[in-house]
Amino acid sequence: AEMIEKRHRIEDALEAVKAAQQEGIVPGGGVALVRALPKKAGSTAEQIVYEAVKEPIRQMARNAGESPDLILEQVQKEEGSRGYNFATGKMGDLLEEGVIDPVKVTITALTMAASAAGTLLTTGYAIIEGE
């Protein structure tokens, strides 16, 4: 079972490298998604996507034992590739520090968020799992 897990991790890493080579990289740690946001969301669909793309950085903060709202606020004050490095616990230039995501992965995340927003808008009722 452990060997299978290691194999899957290696395969995932290889796919990420291929994706990065094909389409490039962006700052990781959820920063590229936050930077893609407009300053304010307008329509209901935009509001859903607006909140959805903030969730990866919030989850990483929770996983690191940090305050999701505080980390998100700090990252939103920064510009470019500056963000919170969860490995060091400090703000920094994530591209320089090697905290990166393939563009393809980031685009997929935005596409999925938009798809979820569309589904929610066309659904009469939804059961939402609370925290």
Where are the regions a protein language model picked out?
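Extended, low-charge hydrophobic alpha-helical regions
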Residues: A1-E131
